[in-house]
Amino acid sequence: RLDHSHVAEGLTFLGLQGMMDPPRPEAIVSVRQCQRAGIAVKMITGDHLITARAIAGQIGLKGHEEHGQLVALSGRELEKVSDEKLPAVAERTAVFARVAPEQKLRLVRALQSRGHVVAMTGDGVNDAPALKQADIGVAMGISGTDVAKGAAAMILTDDNFASIEAAV
């Protein structure tokens, strides 16, 4: 069994690398335009909650705030929310991080139960159930899997959120 004492000495720090994948500038503008038009934009991501909040800030995502921060939930927190409470929670939450495929489907259904018309974007096999359930499932045409494209009502040929805003 390997523990800290086995590697505590004789090591040399070689370096640290950071990577960043910033949002596209046109996505930032499109999110703002959608919000101005009264569309509640929500982000469901596989990223860590802290990363998701940072991206939400970069793209100007608006929504309810608690303690000066945008309301955001992790998949672990979301799984504890009852079906009865989920519609209200889904409405007031702007960011969902580390969400499982079945949770995406629950979110779509919860918003629809409140009378919302739900558009859902996705690119993977895991997105297919939510894409199919959404009023408008939107698959990525370049990076999307065939399963996601088959489940969607619309395919974004350029994988660009701005195209959704233009279509609206």
Report each predicted region and the residues it spans.
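Cytosolic catalytic headpieces and adjacent flexible linkers of membrane translocases
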Residues: 1-110, 114, 128, 134-136, ...
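Hydrophobic "anchor" residues on beta-strands that sit immediately upstream
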Residues: 43, 118-119, 123
